[in-house]
A protein has these predicted regions:
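Mature-region segments of soluble proteins
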Residues: 6-18, 22-26, 30-138
Length: 138
């Protein structure tokens, strides 16, 4: 990879699962590291697609706000992501599919076995443990 995906993956992780008063965001939980490790393995096609997605989002952010995606702040990042997912950005099929894949991998990283780089200190599991579940039917 010519440029590091780390800041981009960290931005995406915190957009998928933002930090709030209940706990850490996706980046602090390790979701970005999980995705980085997955892309470093035998998934070179996915790594190239994610780099192309980063280029697309950087270009869009520069066009609208004069800075790359990682530097425009959460509200603008969310706006760009939502535009792609809603097809408002007129993105090609591969861009949409890559963003969806990246979101899926990020969610995996929130709850994966910590040995794979995500779910740091089992924070994702602890968040799930605090959730209320509906009663089971008998």
């Amino acid at each position: 990879m010519e440029k590091s995906l780390r800041p981009f993956l960290e931005s995406i992780a915190d957009r998928v699962f933002p930090p709030d008063e209940l706990g850490p965001g996706g980046c602090d939980i390790g979701a970005a590291e999980y995705v980085r490790r997955r892309l470093a393995g035998p998934r070179s096609a996915d790594r190239l697609a994610v780099a192309a997605l980063q280029d697309h989002l950087d270009a869009s952010a520069r066009e609208h706000w004069g800075a790359p995606f990682c530097d425009v702040g959460a509200p603008h990042q969310e706006r760009l992501i939502e535009a792609i997912l809603a097809d408002d950005a007129q993105a090609d099929v591969e861009t949409v599919a890559t963003l969806r894949l990246l979101i899926d991998m990020t969610v995996e990283g929130l709850f994966a076995d910590p040995g794979h780089g995500g779910n740091r200190n089992e924070a994702g599991w602890r968040l799930l443990a605090g959730m209320a579940y509906p009663p089971r039917a008998r």
